Swiss-Prot record:
GO terms for biological process: division septum assembly; sporulation resulting in formation of a cellular spore. The keyword Cell cycle applies. It comes from the Bacteria. Keywords: Cell cycle, Cell division, Septation. Could be involved in septation. This is Putative septation protein SpoVG. It holds the Pfam family SpoVG. SUPFAM superfamilies: SpoVG-like (SSF160537). Belongs to the SpoVG family. InterPro entries: SpoVG, SpoVG_sf.
């Protein structure tokens, strides 16, 4: 199985999330809502997850071996490094808003 497409949007935020990502596997299966996160040891790709009733986060989809995890990490980070455009976070306050 190969990563055949990566769609990435860098996000401008004060938080640790740096980008939202969708990947396509074998030109046949798409996984949305991966995230590039700034961790203590640098950037890494987090799999899509949801919060459980007890407050824990649980992956919705994830690779089951280290080779596939590394392929996803490499493909996403290559596109991340090549992407210059940063989209402002919708939740960030805008100081230059014209609304009164």
């Amino acid at each position: 199985m190969k990563v055949t497409d990566v769609r990435l949007r860098k996000i401008q935020t004060d938080g640790r999330m740096k980008a939202l990502v969708s990947i396509t596997l074998d030109e046949a299966f798409v996984i949305h809502d991966l995230r590039v996160i700034e961790g203590n040891s640098g950037l890494f790709v987090a799999m899509p997850s949801k919060r459980t009733p007890d407050g824990e986060f649980r992956d919705i989809a994830h690779p089951i071996n280290s080779d596939m995890r590394q392929e996803i990490q490499d493909a996403v980070m290559k596109v991340y490094d090549e992407t210059d455009e940063v989209i402002p976070d919708k939740n960030a306050s805008s100081e230059d808003s014209d609304e009164a």
